[in-house]
Swiss-Prot record:
Name of the gene this protein is made from: cobD
Subcellular location field: Cell membrane
Keywords carried by this UniProt record: Cell membrane, Cobalamin biosynthesis, Membrane, Transmembrane, Transmembrane helix
Metabolic or biological pathway, per its Swiss-Prot or TrEMBL entry: Cofactor biosynthesis; adenosylcobalamin biosynthesis
Role noted for this protein: Converts cobyric acid to cobinamide by the addition of aminopropanol on the F carboxylic group.
Cellular component GO terms held in the UniProt record: plasma membrane
Protein's name according to its UniProt entry: Cobalamin biosynthesis protein CobD
Gene Ontology molecular function terms on file: ABC-type vitamin B12 transporter activity; threonine-phosphate decarboxylase activity
Lineage: Bacteria, Bacillati, Bacillota, Bacilli, Bacillales
Topology in membrane: Multi-pass membrane protein
GO annotation terms (biological process): cobalamin biosynthetic process
Amino acid sequence: MSVLFYTISFILDFILGDPYSWPHPIKVIGNFIQLLTNALRKIFHGKSLYFAGGLLFILTVGMTGIVSWLILYISAKIAFWLYAAVFIYLGYTTLAMTCLAKEARKIQRTLADGDLEAARVQVGMIVGRDTDKLTAEQISKATIETVAENTADGVIAPLFYLFIGGPVLALMYKAVNTLDSMVGYKNEKYRAIGFVSAKMDDLANFIPARLSWFFLVIASFILKYDGRTAWRIGLRDRKNHTSPNCAYPEGAVAGALGITLGGTHEYFGETVVKPTIGSGTKAVTQKEISQTIHLLYTASIIAFLIFISIHLILF
């Protein structure tokens, strides 16, 4: 029965994405993180913020697991149909495939209209770097990098944990990922309180990131992109990122499309020097955004089919 629930969750994400007006657990988790972070900052200062960051991680992930388990448990006690609906909905909310594609297409359309200022604002909604001075090509690159990275932590990783431990484990993973996106920065403000969250996010994404590289390589062959180079660049440039995971999917996409990603960016006014990923020399345009979206969908479907096949064999 769980296989049917997983399938419906995946199809719902494929069709609907994440409508902004719908209630969403990740929004609740984000609000909880913000409130708890503010409270902990009033109590802890200096180096003790490292300890506070540990509390932040344990309380956020722990509460996410407990609350989601209780919701499923109570719904099961009331009626099976309610349990099924809650299971499917919670699983669906952990996936970000179509939402990610929609955001990328918005930026693509704005660039096509020649509205650079609006495109800078839009890309600033999905990346952590400063975007107010980006060129059209830099905006395209930032969009592609985000889609590539989030193919791993927005789709493949939630699917991975969903098939292992159902919506509870998938939501706990999303809590880890949300913590990293909110406090896992290396600047002065977040270095201490976000240290534990950043390290745990690296750990949680260790396997999914490498699986994402593999699925993106397969997708590259299916779409008749450069699959061999996707394989090679993903391995060659796997360490060309401050994260131990991000270069795997970004390298696969860069190799598949024959482009170069990464490099130096500004974050909160500070210049962060990063190595490049890929060795392509062609200019990056809106066309490559479309190709990256195709890779996102194809790799996600491949991952789902492989995970569901393994689940059927084992269970």
